[in-house]
Amino acid sequence: MEKMTVSSNYTIALWATFTAISFAVGYQLGTSNASSTKKSSATLLRSKEMKEGKLHNDTDEEESESEDESDEDEDIESTSLNDIPGEVRMALVIRQDLGMTKGKIAAQCCHAALSCFRHIATNPARASYNPIMTQRWLNAGQAKITLKCPDKFTMDELYAKAISLGVNAAVIHDAGRTQIAAGSATVLGLGPAPKAVLDQITGDLKLY
């Protein structure tokens, strides 16, 4: 009788254990499937919204406008600065009143730096062409500095002062396809030029 009771109890315990394991496995599989279904549904929904134009990628949008940027420059003869000793650098002056995102600012600074380099280094027919200053800048590590500018009025003053001192300069105007009005002056590029001369122009500005 005791053997039958022990055997019966063992069978019940074994059945209970098996049931518990089955329940746990079933719950785990159900949770996993539900999670996968939710992820798949979210992915499909996002894909559909992107196709319908409801979602967009700000980075791609900013990059797509890059070819439409324009610069304002005067062909400035800067060879008179070649004999000034010391560090040669480029300054990128960023307007603060436009509310540009960091990505937007980075793109505009790239435009300004490339524009300044093209003016001073790529076309011997231009008055702004200055291979000596370019080489000094390249040999010293292409130093660049980013500075804050409060508004368009201040930027115009800085640009005029750069021209009067014979410093290579370019103002970048936005295409107006994403964040700000078309034609807005966003970044002023200065140089490459001796730091001593740039400080006369931007000495009162704060670092960005």
UniProtKB/Swiss-Prot annotation:
One of its GO terms (cellular component) is mitochondrion. There is a cross-link at K152 (Glycyl lysine isopeptide (Lys-Gly) (interchain with G-Cter in ubiquitin)). Residues 46-58 have a biased composition (Basic and acidic residues). Residues 32-81 are annotated as: Disordered. It holds the Pfam family PTH2. It catalyses: an N-acyl-L-alpha-aminoacyl-tRNA + H2O = an N-acyl-L-amino acid + a tRNA + H(+). Residues 59-77 have a biased composition (Acidic residues). GO terms for molecular function: peptidyl-tRNA hydrolase activity. It comes from the Eukaryota. Residues 32-45 have a biased composition (Low complexity). It is found in: Cytoplasm. The keyword Ubl conjugation applies. It is an enzyme of class 3 (hydrolase). The keyword Ubl conjugation applies. Its EC number is 3.1.1.29. Keywords: Cytoplasm, Hydrolase, Isopeptide bond, Ubl conjugation. One of its GO terms (biological process) is negative regulation of proteasomal ubiquitin-dependent protein catabolic process. The natural substrate for this enzyme may be peptidyl-tRNAs which drop off the ribosome during protein synthesis. Belongs to the PTH2 family. Present with 2190 molecules/cell in log phase SD medium. This is Peptidyl-tRNA hydrolase 2. It comes from Saccharomyces cerevisiae (strain ATCC 204508 / S288c).
